[in-house]
């Protein structure tokens, strides 16, 4: 199962601190071999800036190591972080969470039947699918 973290605060927080520098940083939960072992298929963060969502994500197949430091200066009062343990879809950046559609963001833990969900999607949402994951299909 994936690892999810979210924060809402009155004042902007340094996202990197919570992911990599806190006494028990969030990234450490991805390194532990709990429930299926390391969550190193990909990672991503979504944060809100002036009422617009921004996303940074990386997939294991696209980088040698994860670059958590690339978000070192990000500040936001709302953010979501996801450490992926792939079950469906390759370990690529496009399959890393969170996903964005218009002004909505989504991250997911678990598995659903992708083909069954696609049957119920309107064609306009099917055209929006960018990943191979069940999660993005469920989101749309």
Predicted stretch roles:
Residues 15, 55, 89-91, 114-117:
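Short helix/loop capping segments that flank catalytic or ligand/cofactor-binding pockets
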Residues 2, 104-116:
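Conserved beta-strand-loop-short alpha-helix elements that form
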Residues 29-30, 59-70, 81-102, 120-122:
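Short acidic (Asp/Glu) patches
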Residues 113-140:
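Short histidine
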């Amino acid at each position: 199962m994936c690892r999810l973290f979210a924060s809402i605060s009155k004042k902007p927080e340094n996202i990197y601190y919570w992911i990599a520098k806190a006494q028990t940083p969030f990234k450490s939960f991805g390194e532990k071999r709990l429930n299926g072992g390391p969550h190193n298929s990909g990672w991503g963060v979504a944060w809100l800036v002036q009422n617009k969502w921004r996303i940074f994500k990386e997939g294991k197949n696209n980088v040698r190591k994860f670059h958590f430091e690339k978000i070192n200066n990000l500040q936001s009062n709302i953010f979501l972080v996801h450490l992926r343990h792939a079950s469906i879809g390759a370990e690529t950046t496009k399959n890393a969470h969170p996903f964005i559609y218009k002004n909505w963001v989504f991250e997911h833990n678990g598995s659903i039947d992708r083909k069954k969900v696609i049957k119920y999607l309107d064609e306009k949402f099917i055209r929006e699918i960018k990943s191979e994951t069940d999660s993005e299909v469920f989101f749309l």
